[in-house]
């Protein structure tokens, strides 16, 4: 028996067979081996198996994909083997009891020159739970469960455990999906999350939607208490680290004013010969979080900390993230240091990593360092001021080196949510990245590169932060879209892929666009065509940073990837442990962990964005009828999104625009009947017509 025989049997059986029938045809020969082969073929997307224990051959009559539902009751499904192709339309009658996010087997049907998909079977029920609100029915007689996920708008919900789970109006609850029949969902209520009238509870419910843990397990908290030993009590460990001590250095932290999980600290020294030493000291989380402990297991499940508008959902319990591991000022801390030397031009000429003990002498924040850079206002000791001056000097040199080599850089604003003490949104404002944030970023990037290069040269298993080059066609599309703004770099496709030429194009955008918001939107449009950075075992480099080798070393309090990096640095460099079995285990673990943390990172980013969106809707909910100036951020088939000065964004639906509008996919513009058009960057005046808190949706209309 081999894979080819299995595939031949499935193919001869009309490309579908039950696992039992397959085993029978193979005379039940070596069932564990059959299981392994099927698993491998499934992972390679050659075969797929379903909840009904059937096996399908993919690429012929049957395809596999994830179903995405529209609130109106129909859906779309993509083909995993052709992810770039347009998704297939699935009418309500062809859903076969499946719903949003389900992994399904489907077949394509051509009906009167129209192509649609029919769901054949369910492979995997991705969504197990629904979050929603208990609301009173229109006639006031009943309490209904309304899911927050708009993909389930068209479903009726029946609660199976109403008697043992009394419900009240305005409750936000979590429900487990039990079964589905046509457009009827049967659920069991699992827990009450909070009150829909409280902003803080609404935010917490979004974290629950994304299945991000909001509480730690008891075993994890118990382990956190066990390892909570002040540095001063670990005399032997202190003595061991004293040979590489940073206690006499002017080490400082620079973070957000509200930050509590302080991972990183810096010290810069300018030498007499004009060269520089940069010390990047990172909290030694691996000293406290050992592999396979409850702390470690839950940290891997979480993957990273998630930063919401009014709270942090940390990767580690706060006793570690905000206290024991955090590089709080005037307290001895264990750290891993990356010491780098730079020449007079800002080029790194040496690097080393070691365990150390340190004290952060000053706790600085970005605002005050930005103020110092702008106006030379300083409220701390003179020694720290001198160090910051040298840090700024080195930062400027490194920045120029990175730009020359092709690091893609541009400034973008982010929406910042301002809340009162009750977590009610009182303001949304645009936050610009300052010079101090860029300084820390450049120093952290340098340390990440240095660490990655050290281990890469040792040819040992390691976790890398890879960023693949963009797809050539995607990048051509981006360059093409710039022509409607009068920007045409006249590059060959090969030249377009060169990061240096991308930087030159970004510079031209800056020079030719008079409006900074238009420039920002054009810069952001590039990101849509970029590959997503991810964690992997094999190094392929980082395109965006124009780096041959990159990892994440600088944030082990809030990223599990960095915790892995610290452990392997200690194993390889400090303990010089190259045991072959241990290396094989490292390789296997990196592969497993990378899959998990790539997913948790995406989930956290999506959750953070959804919270910001929910907060902007809440902020605009009492501004219905108000008129504002805005900028078109993107034109799509169904309308235009308009961004206000404070980065609040709303949709002008195509039904509220002029009739007979045509969408130009190439230039991303909506063409009106008089040949004028709507495109990104245009200034418009809008009126707010709705802000639906439950749907998290803002609607505008244009005002003449």
Give the ranges of each region predicted by the language model:
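Charge-lined substrate channels and their catalytic hotspots, especially those that engage the 3′ end
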Residues: 1-279, 286-332, 370, 669-679, ...
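Electropositive polyanion-binding surfaces
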Residues: 24, 169, 174, 180, ...
